[in-house]
Amino acid sequence: MKIAMTTKEASEKWGISQRRVRVLCRDGKIEGCIQKGKLWIIPENTKKPADGRIKGKESLLELIEQKKKELDIRRPLTEGEVSKLHEDFMIEYTYNSNAIEGNTLTLRETDMVLKGLTIDRKPLKDHMEAVGHKEAFYFICHLVKNSYPLCESVIKQIHSLVLADRPFDRGIYRRIPVRIHGAKHNPVQPYLIEAKMNDLMKNYAEDRRNIVIKLAELHIGFESIHPFIDGNGRTGRLIVNLELMKAGYPPIDIKFTDRMRYYDSFADKEKMIKLFAEYLNRRLDQYLQILG
């Protein structure tokens, strides 16, 4: 008589993905499951666990606000603690944000480059992008400390650090038309960039809605303008984190493995809101767990 089942068998039995079964095992939501190496063994008669995930954008945004309030109660972290959290976050964030744009460094290689090492047979450009992104992240941390408002000048400064490998294009709006492969719409013409960026900053400054909603719209708007010749994606994601941290939230790290979902979200504001909200919700959980 069979007394146990694999995650694949549980997935088929319960009608959920195998990945979801593994997550439930890892989070202790499946009673009696045992991990053996990389495998999970689940008792045959175990009932399907309740799906505790938050459904719907509004309820997830409400949950984020609740967790933010809880985080505020447990603070403040010391400057050293914040610095350590940012350092740990920055390495993987730099890897993911650069990888989304085609950088070939692995996570381990990115870590090594940020420690001053050189990776054999990897382009100098990839090394410089890693270092530039690191500097840009620490720059936005400085901006958060000093409560600098978001403006075009700040965005250009962020971009000038991101584009470490292109000194003549750093912090300068493009002067030629560009096309984004796979995009449904072309970025605005160069002569419209100044006006469009001015409108984007004005609308964002006047927006009083939930931080996740307005940042999703800001990000889509910024990337649709595509103001720089290169480095728009990395700069745009740094802007999102700058504003999250200024509002007292932890920064988010959109994973390279999630890039297709991220790309698809540019065509649907609701998808981008949901993507940002899910990442922010998980980051808040991490911070709350650290603080006990």
Model-derived features: where do they sit?
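FIC/Doc superfamily catalytic core
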Residues: 1-13, 18-29, 44-230, 234-292
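Minor-groove-contacting beta-hairpin "wing" of winged helix-turn-helix DNA-binding domains
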Residues: 37-44
